[in-house]
């Protein structure tokens, strides 16, 4: 089982957790750790330390943070460097969190991260590209009817 700590600037991790709850319901071992204006990296590391106390020893731990190289990322990196059962992915969004929640009971952490790499490219979509595909398909259908 993989426990998840979502972290990021402001209320972002709290909102992300609430949004996932609207879709999947309440999840165990999903912890939101916000980083607020005026807090330093030591404060955030203490929040992580407190969150980790609530996670069973046998669980792997995935930190999902908003920005690569930001304070939430840097604070988590110090824990990951000390514990091989932990890792992190930056650039979290709702589709990525939902993917994690749907797979975390079935995959090991490294396998889950590999899935996320592939999935993250698919979660970013441009509407006009899809509309163009529909338009082209409709034109092809009309031409076939003639």
Swiss-Prot record:
Q: Enumerate the active-site residues.
A: 9
Keywords noted in UniProt: Cytoplasm, Kinase, Phosphoprotein, Phosphotransferase system, Sugar transport, Transferase, Transport
| Gene Ontology biological process terms from the UniProt entry | phosphoenolpyruvate-dependent sugar phosphotransferase system
Protein name (database record): PTS system fructose-specific EIIA component
Q: Say which species the protein is native to.
A: Bacillus subtilis (strain 168)
The UniProt record lists the PTS EIIA type-4 domain at: 1-124
Main subcellular localisation: cytoplasm
Q: Name one Pfam family in it.
A: EIIA-man
The family database entries (InterPro entries) matched by this protein are listed as:
Bacterial_PTS_sugar_comp (IPR051471), PTS_EIIA_man (IPR013789), PTS_EIIA_man-typ (IPR004701), PTS_EIIA_man-typ_sf (IPR036662), PTS_IIA_man (IPR033887)
Report TM segments.
none
Q: Which residues carry this modification: Phosphohistidine?
A: 9
Task: Supply one GO CC term from the record.
Answer: cytoplasm
> What does this gene product do?
The phosphoenolpyruvate-dependent sugar phosphotransferase system (sugar PTS), a major carbohydrate active transport system, catalyzes the phosphorylation of incoming sugar substrates concomitantly with their translocation across the cell membrane. The enzyme II LevDE PTS system is involved in fructose transport. LevD and LevE act as negative regulators of the levanase operon. They may be involved in a PTS-mediated phosphorylation of a regulator.
């Amino acid at each position: 089982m993989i426990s998840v700590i979502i972290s990021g600037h402001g209320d972002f991790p709290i909102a992300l957790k609430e949004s996932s709850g609207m879709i999947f319901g309440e999840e165990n071992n999903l912890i939101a750790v916000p980083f607020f204006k005026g807090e330093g990296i030591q404060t955030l590391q203490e929040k992580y330390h407190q969150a980790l106390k609530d996670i069973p020893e046998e669980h792997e731990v995935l930190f999902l943070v908003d920005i690569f190289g930001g304070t939430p990322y840097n604070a988590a990196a110090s824990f990951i460097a000390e514990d091989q059962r932990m890792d992190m992915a930056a650039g979290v969004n709702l589709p990525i969190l939902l993917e994690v929640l749907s797979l975390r009971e079935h995959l090991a952490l490294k396998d889950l991260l590999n899935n996320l790499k592939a999935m993250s490219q698919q979660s970013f979509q441009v509407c006009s590209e899809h509309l163009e595909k529909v338009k082209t398909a409709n034109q092809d259908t009309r031409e076939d009817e003639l």
